[in-house]
């Protein structure tokens, strides 16, 4: 017997839409555009909703009787509703045992339905708070990750600086050129108020030739240093 085929609990992805969103189609602008936003009303779970409706609609607007006052403690009311559901469920079991065909059975079912609606409504009123809390936790995680990244970068930077300092300390003292010759000289820019272009060009050529000589001297010193390092056992 072959292995049993695993069936996914979710429906398969819509391949007729996925194949249209290739990289080539997106780059060429051939991918289908998203549907326009809904402006009036829409259907969801068999019910019609308006776009300007509140996310959490009041119970009265849905034709449902309110069992708790306008000002209340959510935790306290949820505990009371939970206890009421348990008591009504036990009453329903007692009715089913004593008189299954009694009309009280339907009344008790309606009471349980109303209690569950209130429980879900109070839980949904916590959704904005849950969204804010989720966003806060996400931002804290991002902050911690960035701080850890910055700390790792600082450690690597300190390690690189230490390696460079060790390399500089291990350089031999008998270099062909002095340390001052190895440094990059920074001099203030010469300003010439004259408008003689020929003099300026000659000065630029002299400066460029001087810089080229400095670069050649530094390259020679570096080559000598590398040769000495290779000759060491």
From Swiss-Prot:
Subcellular location: Nucleus
BP-aspect Gene Ontology terms: regulation of transcription by RNA polymerase II
Subunit structure: Component of the Mediator complex, which is composed of MED1, MED4, MED6, MED7, MED8, MED9, MED10, MED11, MED12, MED13, MED13L, MED14, MED15, MED16, MED17, MED18, MED19, MED20, MED21, MED22, MED23, MED24, MED25, MED26, MED27, MED29, MED30, MED31, CCNC, CDK8 and CDC2L6/CDK11. The MED12, MED13, CCNC and CDK8 subunits form a distinct module termed the CDK8 module. Mediator containing the CDK8 module is less active than Mediator lacking this module in supporting transcriptional activation.
UniProt xrefs under InterPro entries: Immune_Mod/Transcr_Coactivator, Med7/Med21-like, Mediatior_Med7, Mediatior_Med7_sf
UniProt-recorded name of the protein: Mediator of RNA polymerase II transcription subunit 7
Keyword field: Activator, Isopeptide bond, Nucleus, Phosphoprotein, Transcription, Transcription regulation, Ubl conjugation
GO cellular component: mediator complex
Chief localisation class: nucleus
Gene: MED7
Region (Disordered): 185-213
Compositionally skewed regions (Basic and acidic residues) per UniProt: 203-213
Family, as annotated: Belongs to the Mediator complex subunit 7 family.
Organism (species): Bos taurus (Bovine)
